[in-house]
Amino acid sequence: MHNEERPILEDMDRLPFVTPVYKRDLKIENYFNGYLRHPYLSFYTGRGCKSHCTFCLWPQTVGGYRYRTRSIGHVVEEVAWAQKAFPQVKEFFFDDDTLTDNLPRVQALAQELGKLGIVWACNAKANVPRETLKILRDNGLRLFLVGYETGNQQILYNIKKGMRIEFARRFTRDCHDLGIKIHGTFILGLPGETKETIEETIRFATEINPHTIQVSLAAPYPGTYLHRQALENGWLDNSNAELVDEYGVQLAPLHYPHLTHSEIFDSVETFYRRFYFRAGKIASIVGEMLSSPQMMKRRLREGVEFFHFLRERRELAH
């Protein structure tokens, strides 16, 4: 049985604050995120995303393509409440799919957050104008999480990303100039991927040089355009349909006539090694570690986790 879809909630201010639930049920010090300061708090200021990325689960199955937002006053009220309830918080993360989808709103929100004196981060698309970047930075923005996905323009077209490589380069350069950190995310194995485009993406990542990166494998979630596309084109078969293994390690479910599952899977480790094992990047990480005992402890923990991750992937491959 499939019931009719419920009407989408339009008045987002009707939603209760989530932070009192955190206060009641969570010890936030137990939750770590490699690119955010610790401890941090994360919540939403809106639902939905205007982008039509073929692989993305959230707008296609949950939030929709209209960005429905809480009022700025409602968001600021919750942040102010959370400041008092969690004085130990070092950073707030706004987990909207793309907080920068509405430039006038994010600028106005930033100016109100600036009055509270908080440090914050958010998801962003790599097309934010420099003028907006300045406003956000001057009002507490420290970091963007940016989905670059690939360094190949044709693949960006294939996945309907709505982004051009030159815009991403300019945005990243502006962020570097303004002192805004970037955690860049990339996806290998998207439609149109080849050995050559993987190499192109690795070179692109090292060229633009975000502060940190995350490299994922294309995941054809049921309900997405990518899933339907994969079935129609024979890129997904029953013997390799799982997205993760029993230990949570991500698998490479897609394959192409010119690119096998294992070639896509193995390229993730190659990507990480070539990005992080560069002299300049190593020097940057060491410099961060020497900046404070907290950063030393954090980077050492992350290093252990990183090598554990690589070992798990290598064991899975064999």
Model region roles, listed by residue range:
Residues 17-183, 190, 195, 200-203:
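Radical SAM [4Fe-4S] cluster-binding motif and immediate context
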Residues 5, 15, 55, 106-107, ...:
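Short aromatic-enriched loop/helix-cap "lid" or pocket-rim segments at secondary-structure transitions
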